[in-house]
UniProtKB/Swiss-Prot annotation:
Belongs to the MLO family. GO terms for cellular component: extracellular region; Golgi apparatus; plasma membrane; plasmodesma. This is MLO-like protein 2. The chain crosses the membrane at residues 16-36, 62-82, 165-185, 288-308, 318-338, 372-392, 416-436. Keywords: Calmodulin-binding, Membrane, Pathogenesis-related protein, Phosphoprotein, Plant defense, Transmembrane, Transmembrane helix. Residues 473-490, 498-513 have a biased composition (Polar residues). Residues 522-548 have a biased composition (Basic and acidic residues). GO terms for molecular function: calmodulin binding. The gene is MLO2. Residues 37-61, 186-287, 339-371, 437-573 are cytoplasmic. Disulfide bonds: none annotated.
Length: 573
């Protein structure tokens, strides 16, 4: 009979067939590995450290998939040999009993086999289906050991094989989906470049002259947000809900939030020198590393989604709408935060001087954590990717008409809602998130570019080693006079917030122009986006001082007194 036909082993297989399969698998694997390595090299060459770290996360996900694949392959036979009763196995199926009987030739649950009532055609169909499944299974002997005991396998060998494919499809679709969303969001944010360049024009500086006094409601930012609907919570959320669909990020909002960020974190006079758009791009690249990763919490959510595919739960009516509802709430919340920033301006007074200054703060965000919004966006992207991956996998395995898609409406709902969520994430929520989350109480480490950040980390690491080994003196003499400490060019003291407010008495008289006259005013803020040529000029200038007057040049580094002073500066990820 057909169900007694067993698959051939390697002893019965041609060696050339085995060699061809191994060659193809190795060739594809080597090409993929080499491609990933080339992409990583390109990211390093372009100084895209955040994207390189995101690529490392993708490689970690691929390694995790390799472990899952190995475990499924090894545990396929032991798992399929676990037997459970037919009563337990008949619960929570994707198909109804009638659908299973029609599709697989199984009798309805609860009916006993009387031997005469079963139609010969149905019996033949059952035998054909079972033999087909056994032929396609991996590492099976072609028969079900549990059937001999009158029981059912916990998960059949072929079922594990199908699950194996789905997990791989889910991971790949999630990564691709995140990349597409990030790319579309970057395209949407290209318009910000012209806004950023406008801040360096004379017209912008004149219109925002600090000597000008205006009513808060008469400013462009005030006219957009200070209205009657912003006085009550209900009308505020309703208006912000619809506002996200029509110009979620406007020029007025961008310029106001940019000005507030710079005034909160930098010394006055640096507004035209700081590139806020590039800072947002670096922050978004770093957040992309988190989004592209499938964390244990996200894997747990995937398991819950698999559980909801039981017949009777009708998951197709509510599961696709979860990411849609969440992303709409997140977008509304981000719009509400912008409006509340405007209301804070009015609370300080009806008259503003120059450009309106918004006051950032973590209290504007849920639970006082701006990163919580990133988690919700991560959850939305994964949920939507899960819907797409599950649809593609189930269609490939069981055709379009299957138990997971009970009707055409199910397919339409999944695809339409998935497309809507994709558009909202890319063109509405992601640009809003990138801008509004900068309004927290603290600025992110990405305020420095990769070159400056690397110098800061090296300086901090060297300073910690000096303190740890007790190589500094207890006086105010700076430790930088020692040859192993960072030089003037790598000292980050002039990068720190409120540096201009520190007492100049801690720094003895120095020939450096930074602490005298016009030079001090000009270099009070080291522009992270300065050109490489300027950095080289500064480096050569400091080397000249070190060669001629090493003692005086070393005075420009901050002193290290105790380990507590080191904790005042940290560069954590």
């Amino acid at each position: 009979m057909a169900d007694q036909v067993k698959e051939r082993t390697l002893e019965e297989t041609s060696t050339w067939a085995v060699a061809v399969v191994c060659f193809v698998l190795l060739f594809i694997s080597i090409v993929l590995e080499h491609s990933i390595h080339k992409i990583g090299t390109w990211f390093k060459k372009k100084h895209k450290q955040a994207l390189f770290e995101a690529l490392e996360k993708v490689k970690a996900e691929l390694m995790l998939l390799g472990f899952i694949s190995l475990l499924l392959t090894i545990g396929q036979t032991p798992i399929s040999n676990i037997c459970i009763s037919q009563k337990v196995a008949s619960t929570m199926h994707p198909c109804s009993a009638a659908e299973e009987a029609k599709k697989y030739g199984k009798k309805d649950a609860g009916k006993k086999d009387d031997g005469d009532g079963d139609k010969p055609g149905r019996r033949l169909l059952l035998e054909l289906a079972e033999s087909y499944i056994h032929r396609r299974s991996l590492a099976t002997k072609g028969y079900d050991k549990c059937a001999e005991k009158g029981k059912v396998a916990f998960v059949s060998a072929y079922g594990i094989h199908q699950l194996h494919i789905f997990i791989f499809v889910l991971a790949v679709v999630h990564v691709v989906y995140c990349i597409v969303t990030y790319a579309f969001g970057k395209i949407k944010m290209r318009t910000w470049k012209s806004w950023e360049e406008e801040t360096k024009t004379i017209e912008y500086q004149y219109s925002n002259d600090p000597e000008r006094f205006r009513f808060a409601r008469d400013t462009s930012f005030g006219r957009r947000h200070l209205n009657f609907w912003s006085k009550t919570r209900v009308t505020l959320w309703i208006v912000c809900f619809f506002r996200q669909f029509f110009g979620s990020v406007t020029k007025v909002d961008y310029l106001a939030l940019r000005h507030g960020f710079i005034m909160a974190h930098f010394a006055p006079g640096n507004e035209s020198r700081f590139d806020f758009r590039k800072y947002i791009q670096r922050s978004l690249e770093k957040d992309f590393k988190t989004v592209v990763e499938i964390s244990p919490v996200i894997w747990f959510v995937a398991v819950l989604f698999l559980l909801t595919n039981s017949y009777g739960l009708r998951s197709y009516l509510w599961l696709p709408f979860i990411p849609l509802v969440v992303i709409l709430i997140v977008g509304t919340k981000l719009e509400v935060i912008i409006t509340k920033l405007g209301l804070r301006i009015q609370e300080k007074g009806d008259v503003v001087r120059g450009a309106p200054v918004v006051q950032p703060g973590d209290d504007l965000f849920w639970f006082g954590k701006p990163r919580f919004i990133l988690f919700l966006i991560h959850l939305v992207l994964f949920t939507n990717a899960f819907q797409l991956a599950f649809f593609a996998w189930s269609t490939y395995e069981f055709n379009l008409n299957n138990c997971f898609h009970e009707s055409t409406a199910d397919v339409v709902i999944r695809l339409v809602v998935g497309a809507v969520v994709q558009i909202l994430c890319s063109y509405v929520t992601l640009p809003l998130y990138a801008l509004v989350t900068q309004m927290g109480s603290k600025m992110k480490p990405t305020v420095f570019n990769d070159r400056v950040a690397t110098a800061l980390k090296k300086w901090h690491h060297t300073a910690k080693n000096e303190t740890k080994h007790g190589r500094h003196s207890g006086s105010n003499t700076p430790f930088s006079s020692r040859p192993t400490t960072p030089t003037h060019g790598s000292s980050p003291i002039h990068l720190l917030h409120n540096f201009n407010n520190r007492s100049v008495e801690n720094y003895p008289s120095s020939p450096s122009p930074r602490y005298s006259g016009h030079g001090h005013h000009e270099h009070q803020f080291w522009d992270p986006e300065s050109q490489h040529q300027e950095a080289e000029t500064s480096t050569h200038h400091s080397l000249a001082h070190e060669s001629s007057e090493p003692v005086l040049a070393s005075v420009e580094l901050p002193p290290i007194r105790t380990s507590k002073s080191l904790r005042d500066f940290s560069f954590k990820k």
